Each structure stands twice: as C-alpha cells, then as structure tokens.
Amino acid sequence: MGSKSVVDMIEAASRAHFSGLHVNGHMNGLEPSALKETTSASEDIQRQPFVIGVAGGAASGKTTVCDMIIQQLHDQRVVLINLDSFYHNLTEEELARVHEYNFDHPDAFDTEHLLSCMEKLRQGQAVDIPKYDFKTYRSSVFRRVNPTDVIILEGILLFHDPRVRKLMNMKIFVCTDADVRLARRIKRDTVENGRDIGTVLDQYSKFVKPAFDDFILPTKKYADIIIPRGGDNHVAIDLIVQHICTKLGQHDLCKIYPNLYVIHSTFQIRGMHTLIRDSQTTKHDFVFYSDRLIRLVVEHGLGHLPFTEKQVITPTGCVYSGVDFCKRLCGVSVIRSGESMENALRACCKGIKIGKILIHREGDNGQQLVYEKLPNDISERHVLLLDPILGTGNSAVEAINLLISKGVPEGNIIFLNLISAPQGVHVVCKKFPRIKIVTSEIDNGLNEEFRVIPGMGEFGDRYFGTDDD
C-alpha cells in the first residue's frame, strides 16, 4: 500500500463518497453513456413475465400438466404458447411427400420466430402467435397474445436450443412410459388429426422414436423439475403451483436470482423506510429507525444459516424438538457504512467476531487501497457481509473477492444490506451465483452520479453525523 497509512485510508474513506467505486468520474466497468440504457433495462425487467418451459416426449401429458397449472393459477394471469405453433409452413414439394417429413426434428421449427415473439412479450408488447393446421400443414390464422404475469411454453424440443432455455425461469420435463405415449399418440392422430393408424405407426418408428432418443431425452438434464406420470402426478403439480405463486409475490429480480431475498414488506417496514429516506428526518430518528430495519435484515439473514435438529427438555419435563444453528459464524463490515450494522449483529449473536474491510479509490490513476482485518479462521466460518447500500456492486465484488481469496467458500457468504439497486444485484449475482443477498427493499436504479434512487442519500454521513451541510 506504499506510504499510505491505515489511518490515512480510513480518514479518506470517512469523507463523502458514493456506494460504487469511481475512477475519473466513471463507475468502474460502466460508462456514463450507457447508464440510461442500464437503468432502463433494470426498469424493463420489472415488467417481465415468469416463464415456465414444459418439455417431454410426444403425448407424454405436457398439455395436461399445463392445463392443470393454468386452472390453479387462474387463466387471466397465464398464457400458454405451444411450440407446435412455430412449425415451418411446408413447401409444395414437401407437401407432396409429407409422410416423409420429420416433424420431430429441431429444423422443423421456426425458432427465430419464437425468440422474436418472446422478446416482444418480455418487453411488454402484444404479439400475434401463428396457429398451425396439421391438416394443411400451414399457419393460416393468428391469435393475439398480450403480456401477462406467467407465460407457459410447451413443446417436445423446448429445451434443445440454449437461447430458448435461457428465457425460462422454470424448466419442467414430463416423463411418461414409452408405451403410454405411443397409445396416446395413436388415439390423438387418428381421432383428432384424421390420419390412419398405419401412417401413424410408420412415422413413429421412422421419426418420433429416433427423435426422442436423439434430441428430446438428452435435454432432460436441463430440467429443474421432472414429473413422472404427467397429469396424474397431482402432488408434483400442486408443489409447482405453490412455488409459482411464491415467485409471483416476489420482486422480479428474485425470480431470476434464487439466492436474492427481499424481506416481507409490511406497513411497519414501509413506514421505517419512509422515515429514513426523508431528507428532513433528524439524525436521532434516522439512526433509531435504521437500527430497527438493520435488526430485521440481520435476523432474516441468520435464518439462512445451516442448522441441525436438536431436542431439549423443557422446565415442564417435556421434550421439545427444535434446531441448533451454525456456531462457526462471523461478521465482516465494509468500512464505513457497514459499521452501522455491527451493533444489530452483536445484539443477535452474543460474542460474535467481526472483521473489517476498507475499499477505496483515489487519485487520477484510480489506485485501489484495501485494508482488511479478518478473523484468522475465517475460511472455516460462515460470513455475514455487512454494507447497508448495494449500489453499483463494484465495492461488493471487491469485498467478496477478498473473502474468497482468504478461503471462504462462496456459498458460505450472506450479503446483508438495507436497499439494493438492480444494477448492483445483477453484478453480484451473476459473478457469484452461490452467494445469498438479503435486503429490505430493491430501489429503481442509479442516477448519473451513481447514487441509488430514490435511495436515502449517503448512509454513512447521515448515520454517523458527518454531513457537510
């Protein structure tokens, strides 16, 4: 660290500073010219739907599963889009030899059109989805699909293209016995599509079965959930619906990042946020209500620690079956704002060890000064990283990288803060997908000065009473 002393570094960090790391007026890794686009993207994501992909072999029960999910979620919130709608129209030459056309091959689908429609729906635009006629082998009519909370995509090869998989928040594979699927296919194609049984069996042995083995079954590994017996598995479908309902009640970023947790909002929490965000709130009230909120965040964060079952004898002589939480724990505060969260952690965890990290950039060359004082055995502990504001995410990344370099497993870090900007959430969660983030609210984004908006100003200055005003 050259001639700079630790005292000088802490003094520098005590002056007015922003939540992100800055170099020559620019946020590290993000140019100001791109700020509006980034902020806009973070706002768009809050309008994006929860996308469920349902794949599996032909006649495995995918449509039945989708219908049951829709019925339990209420159809006004859900739209079903079938991959069959995106078959290519057959040419005259292909129509003349239609029985030799492989409808179960990835090339039979217009994947680009599907991606285009999904992109528009994710941007809040209505789209026209084609309706494929299996008697004429053409799309002659369209149906208008409006943006909605939940989009269910269904199709045999839905997981084949990685670009389509990337759109999905949940991937379900319906697994049904091959004989059952064949019997269903014979019934469907002869009764509904007017085909003769000989043609159906010939197509099954020539195209359907090889396609399942070559293209469909290998994509089973991408599924988040595998449902045996399709629509007959009511327990699995009930669990899926419960999970979807939970996700619908969460902030949209929580649907994308499963390790992001926003504590349940109540009028008490909203009221405390109103007070600490108010520029006219006195220092005494700001500290009082900040401490209350910090305590709630810390308690919620502790709930994500591993535990073991434990039985105790109560004063009445009865046995109580409870849990025993992880004892190998420490806190690490990011100087200076993070120190405001230490008292709440000590109040919740008697005698807990707390380390400190200082990350600061100064000068035209953007030299980074880092000071750290951490427990010697930190690699053996679960770590609660304390910083009340997650802004650009760059300071958090530096702190997390330091912890990992000290041997702390990524999955052992829980990052606690009061408010988070979507940009910071993206940066941290994409780089460290196993880290848990616990926050009390997610704000709109960052302004041109890289401050969280609506935000609460410079937290450290307001909490420790070092405002320049």
Swiss-Prot record:
Residues 259-469 are annotated as: Uracil phosphoribosyltransferase. InterPro entries: P-loop_NTPase, PRibTrfase_dom, PRK/URK, PRTase-like, Uridine_kinase-like. GO terms for biological process: CTP salvage; UMP salvage. GTP binds at residues 283, 292, 326-329, 381. Uracil binds at residues 457-459. It catalyses: UMP + diphosphate = 5-phospho-alpha-D-ribose 1-diphosphate + uracil; cytidine + ATP = CMP + ADP + H(+); uridine + ATP = UMP + ADP + H(+). Keywords: Allosteric enzyme, Glycosyltransferase, GTP-binding, Kinase, Multifunctional enzyme, Nucleotide-binding, Transferase. It holds the Pfam family UPRTase. Pathway: Pyrimidine metabolism; UMP biosynthesis via salvage pathway; UMP from uracil: step 1/1; Pyrimidine metabolism; CTP biosynthesis via salvage pathway; CTP from cytidine: step 1/3; Pyrimidine metabolism; UMP biosynthesis via salvage pathway; UMP from uridine: step 1/1. Allosterically activated by GTP. 5-phospho-alpha-D-ribose 1-diphosphate binds at residues 336, 361, 387, 392-395, 458. Binds 1 Mg(2+) ion per subunit. The magnesium is bound as Mg-PRPP. Residues 46-249 are annotated as: Uridine kinase. Its EC number is 2.7.1.48, 2.4.2.9. GO terms for molecular function: ATP binding; cytidine kinase activity; GTP binding; uracil phosphoribosyltransferase activity; uridine kinase activity. Involved in the pyrimidine salvage pathway. The uracil phosphoribosyltransferase (UPRT) activity, that catalyzes the conversion of uracil and 5-phospho-alpha-D-ribose 1-diphosphate (PRPP) to UMP and diphosphate, is unsure. In the N-terminal section; belongs to the uridine kinase family. This is Uridine kinase-like protein 4. It comes from Arabidopsis thaliana.
